A protein has these predicted regions:
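N-terminal "mature-domain start" segment
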Residues: 18-45, 143-148
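Short, exposed beta-strand-loop hairpins at the edges of beta-sheets
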Residues: 97-101, 111-139
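Short secondary-structure junctions
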Residues: 29-39, 76-88
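Short, surface-exposed coil-to-beta transition loops
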Residues: 39-42, 53-55, 101-110, 119-120
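Signature of long, low-cysteine stretches enriched in small and polar/charged residues
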Residues: 78-116
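A short acidic-to-branched-hydrophobic micro-motif
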Residues: 44-71, 119-126
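Surface-exposed amphipathic alpha-helical segments
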Residues: 30-33, 125-152
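Sec-dependent N-terminal signal peptides
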Residues: 4-15
Length: 152
């Protein structure tokens, strides 16, 4: 199920040979992620664990902010993903979706502050079960700490 959801959210393109200069590709690969898109302004990687499917995108977008990126992702979710709510979190804008076709939940989080100017991180965290507030806060912090460590 997790791989199906990740596939729905990802736009698969051809890989280029030059990774963005702000990304530590070796560190990403060492942590068992699979790189999907490797372009200067759009870089994505995915991983499936026992607890969740994780899809991460680094998007270089000018003239926007984190809240707008979060709203944009919410607006382009597939029809199979029913938007449930926006969740208050200290560190990120979080949107919660239910999968109408396969069950489970998808949480999208976009950090409120950028580590690199105009580089916005978007994480899709796909689980079979609904997360409590504490579990969600822990997931947001754990994943964002890891993902932000991949930025140079």
């Amino acid at each position: 199920m997790k791989k199906i959801i990740l596939g729905l959210f990802l736009i698969l393109g051809t890989l280029s040979f030059a990774s963005p200069s702000f990304v530590d590709v070796n560190k990403i690969k060492q942590n068992s992620y699979e790189i999907r898109d490797d372009e200067d302004d759009f870089f994505t990687f995915v991983k499936s664990t026992d607890e969740a499917g994780i899809s991460v995108a680094f998007n270089v977008i000018e003239d926007t902010n984190s809240k707008e990126v979060s709203e944009m992702i919410k607006s382009i979710a597939p029809d199979s993903q029913k938007f449930l709510s926006s969740i208050n979190n200290k560190r990120a804008y979080v949107n919660k979706f239910a999968d109408n076709e396969n069950g489970g939940f998808t949480y999208n989080f976009v950090p409120k502050t950028e580590k690199i100017k105009n580089c916005y991180i978007s994480v899709l965290y796909v689980t079979d079960s609904e997360l409590s507030s504490t579990e969600l806060d822990n997931a947001v912090n754990k994943i964002l700490n890891e993902v932000e460590s991949y930025l140079k």
